[in-house]
């Protein structure tokens, strides 16, 4: 399964292009632009599993740095600052990784 099976390819491209500048990433706007917030819990869970590259059941900080590439392969990596800000927003229990429930909360806040 790929991201374009769940979200519109054109929406993804526009969202990625909106955040090409370093330190411009805003997860709330990005999730809105790709239409993630409007998706069913099942589809949001599928997106989580696509982003969980090592299939550990968590999105760790190193995977988070590549989150845009999970949506669009030619996208840039997040900066260290952007990655840390996204982790701080998503990691509610402070274990240094985002589980599926924390990801749901992150999407719901967008």
Curated annotation (Swiss-Prot):
Domain EF-hand: 39-74, 78-110
Residue ranges the record marks as coiled coil: none
Superkingdom of origin: Eukaryota
Binding positions for Ca(2+) 2 per the UniProt entry: 91, 93, 95, 97, 102
Keyword Transferase: no
Swiss-Prot/TrEMBL keywords: Acetylation, Calcium, Metal-binding, Muscle protein, Phosphoprotein, Repeat
Domain notes per entry: AB domain, comprising of helices A and B, is involved in structural stabilization, protecting the hydrophobic core of the protein. It is required for high-affinity binding of Ca(2+) and for Mg(2+)-binding.
Residue(s) carrying Phosphoserine: 2, 24
Family membership: Belongs to the parvalbumin family.
Residue numbers binding Ca(2+) 1: 52, 54, 56, 58, 60, 63
Keyword Lipid metabolism: no
Cysteine pairings via disulfide bonds: none
Phylogenetic classification of the source organism: Eukaryota, Metazoa, Chordata, Craniata, Vertebrata
InterPro entries (UniProt xref): EF-hand-dom_pair, EF_Hand_1_Ca_BS, EF_hand_dom, Parvalbumin
GO function terms (MF aspect): calcium ion binding
Modified residues (N-acetylserine): 2
Gene Ontology CC, one term: cytoplasm
Function per UniProt: In muscle, parvalbumin is thought to be involved in relaxation after contraction. It binds two calcium ions.
Protein name, entry field: Parvalbumin alpha
């Amino acid at each position: 399964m790929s991201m374009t099976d769940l979200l519109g390819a054109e929406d993804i491209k526009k969202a990625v292009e909106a955040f090409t500048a370093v330190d411009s990433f805003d997860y709330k706007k990005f999730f809105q632009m790709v239409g993630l917030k409007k998706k069913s819990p099942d589809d949001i869970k599928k997106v989580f599993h696509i982003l969980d590259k090592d299939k550990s059941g968590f999105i760790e900080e190193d995977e988070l740095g590549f989150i845009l590439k999970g949506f669009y392969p030619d996208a840039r990596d997040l900066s260290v600052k952007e990655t840390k800000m996204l982790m701080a927003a998503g990691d509610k229990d402070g274990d240094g990784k985002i589980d599926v429930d924390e990801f749901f909360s992150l999407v719901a806040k967008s």
